[in-house]
Amino acid sequence: DMSLTRTKSKQKVKQTRTPITWKEIKRQKVLLFWAGVMMIYGVIFYYLPLAGWTMAFQNYKPQLGILHSEFVGLQKFQMLFSDVTFLRVIRNTLAMGVINLVATFVTAIVFAILLNEIKSNGGKKTVQTISYLPHFLSWIIVTGILHDMLSGTGIVNEVLVNLHVLSQPINFFAHPGYFWPIVAFANVWKETGWNAIIYLAAITSIDPSLYEAAAIDGAGRWNKIKYVTLPGIKPTIVILLLMNVGNVLNAGFEIQYLLGNGLIQKFSQTIDIYVLKWGISQGDYAIGTAAGIFKSLVSIILIVLANQFAKHNGEEQLF
């Protein structure tokens, strides 16, 4: 009967599972060695430093150390959230993080799809190579380019004045309203080509017969993209979106620090700059640590919520 058949099949499965032998361990010794190295690296550089989080709950004094500094509970967190500057920094970080996420995410997908539509292999490789190059430029170089382009005598002002869009040049870095779009543009220009790599890989894994079937049904390029390409890369899009949601508070440090000035600091400062200012420059390590813990906890919560949302809607999940 059915129960007897299931019992026999389970017994067969158990019989086919061979225990890990010393011979198997020796055969995989290189893999096991590097796995052990990475585990040790993770423990030393990712888990042991978490002991420093105790500073956020202390009136930390470097001369006393973590073990002997006075325990103050959540006092540093209360000070943090009563600081108007920190609340403004949270607003800036969230705003720039969301804008950067949407802008870089969408442009990378669109760029990968458009690149896939180029039929000339030589042309496609040339465009790919050119689009990857900005990723390898440091933010110091990128901000230098932006300063030259957006200065009063820069090419952007010259073009806008010559086209009579502006009556006179403007100082983009003196108006807070321009700062967030400038940061978003810089991130898109720098990372679009690099971020498109994984989408191009996902597109190449789509079965070519699906495109052939769509062509037989009379589908043009747009319909092939809509009904074949986008559904084919949807799992990749969802997974990367879930991973990037947790990085919303990683809105950046270098570009904001290098482009920011006293005129726009109310819109340019992020949590990382706040931590640098209070935690390192002014030596208040407890406040800096508390701000870092807040940032980490919010990132974890965002990832969990995004993952649960994807699970509820039947999409791909991280865990």
What are these regions (language model features)?
Residues 1-24:
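Short, Lys/Arg-rich, polar N-terminal cytosolic tail immediately upstream
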Residues 24-319:
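A structural signal for multi-pass alpha-helical bundles of membrane permease subunits
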